[in-house]
């Protein structure tokens, strides 16, 4: 009789990762539950928030592990999270860009540190509750594909996962939709089958960026000038941390035509605004591109690209650059291309690679 494979499940206390653990137990795997403790849970706002690392979530994950009868461990990565995600979040805003902390967390914490912990515990692979699909080509090379439910596909958030990491990662929910996941959790008698999804950046409870910056980075709330494209002052902003490209609300400017944030000028502490048509651009530059190809491409190729999670993929030409970046040329101009965010490109439903918008 062969020994069942050991699998570690990244358990966040949500329905997706809990259903993942239950499904793998049912399939006969030897399952270990792992939860990352990432942020100080002492704040009452964090404890009751809809973030992904609230105190209630640790309790829920532990209770699910007890229900399933699996070993369960909490791994403290608070210092790593602070440096790699929170400090980067602050520094990115200070540079006049808009960060994507969930991608950074996946890159540095979940699929690096936690994966190494899982393997050290003797697991054959790490499973997560992401809605994405891992496949292998004819040569056994791992590939990352979009989840089968377009409304829940999370492959965009996983583009930094390396091929070496993909060899030891699984996404059991990739072929399912959210309703099926909830039904699965209900079938296993998990108490959180109807639990709400996390919505907020986990260290910014209730999405109150001003309160977060006031405590963690007050320099990002330094007022400065709101200027038009010609440099004329139109008013005063509340600090660069309160704005992002494409934003209209909260500018507090009386103007005959609607104005939108076009760029954040960090050296001069200015918010540059303009009309809606000025938001459209037909190209962008990426740095730190991660290729999910056995041999990274060197020649331009046609692709479908996403400039943000909620955006549909659009036709584009990807031109790899010798410095490890890429130039992306869109067939049609795209609205509010935002420095600091990610652009991910696909061959059909397969992730080819992605990088960070300059």
Curated annotation (Swiss-Prot):
It is found in: Cytoplasm. This is tRNA-specific 2-thiouridylase MnmA. It comes from the Bacteria. The keyword Transferase applies. Pfam families: tRNA_Me_trans, tRNA_Me_trans_C, tRNA_Me_trans_M. It comes from Magnetococcus marinus (strain ATCC BAA-1437 / JCM 17883 / MC-1). The record marks 130, 341 as: Interaction with tRNA. Coiled coil: none annotated. One of its GO terms (biological process) is tRNA wobble position uridine thiolation.
């Amino acid at each position: 009789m062969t020994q069942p494979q050991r699998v570690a499940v990244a358990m966040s206390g949500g329905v997706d990762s809990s259903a993942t653990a239950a499904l793998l137990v049912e399939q006969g795997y030897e399952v270990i539950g792992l939860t990352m403790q990432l942020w100080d849970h002492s704040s009452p706002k964090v404890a009751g928030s809809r973030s992904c690392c609230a105190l209630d979530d640790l309790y829920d994950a532990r209770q699910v592990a007890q229900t399933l009868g699996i070993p369960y461990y909490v791994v403290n990565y608070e210092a790593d999270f602070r440096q790699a995600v929170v400090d980067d979040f602050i520094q990115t805003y200070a540079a006049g860009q808009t960060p994507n902390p969930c991608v950074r967390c996946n890159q540095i914490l979940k699929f690096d540190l936690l994966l190494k912990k899982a393997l050290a515990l003797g697991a054959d692979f790490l499973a997560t509750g992401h809605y994405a699909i891992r496949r292998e080509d004819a040569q056994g090379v791992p590939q990352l594909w979009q989840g089968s439910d377009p409304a829940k596909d999370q492959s965009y958030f996983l583009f930094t996962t390396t091929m070496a990491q993909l060899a030891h990662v699984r996404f059991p929910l990739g072929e399912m939709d959210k309703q099926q996941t909830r039904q699965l959790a209900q079938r296993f008698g998990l108490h959180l089958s109807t639990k709400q999804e996390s919505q907020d950046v986990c260290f910014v409870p209730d999405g109150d960026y001003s309160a977060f910056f006031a405590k963690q980075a007050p320099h990002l709330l330094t007022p400065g000038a709101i200027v038009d494209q010609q440099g004329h002052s139109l008013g005063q902003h509340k600090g660069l941390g309160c704005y992002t490209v494409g934003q209209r609300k909260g500018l507090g400017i009386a103007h005959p035509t609607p104005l939108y944030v076009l760029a954040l000028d960090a050296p001069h502490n200015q918010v540059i605004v303009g009309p809606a048509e000025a938001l459209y651009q037909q190209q962008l530059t990426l740095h730190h591109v991660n290729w999910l190809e056995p041999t990274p491409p060197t020649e331009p190729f046609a692709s479908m690209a996403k400039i943000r999670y909620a955006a549909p993929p659009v036709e584009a030409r990807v031109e790899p650059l010798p410095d490890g970046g890429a130039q992306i040329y869109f067939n049609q101009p795209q609205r509010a291309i935002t420095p600091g965010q990610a652009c991910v490109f696909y061959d059909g439903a397969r992730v080819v690679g992605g990088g960070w918008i300059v």
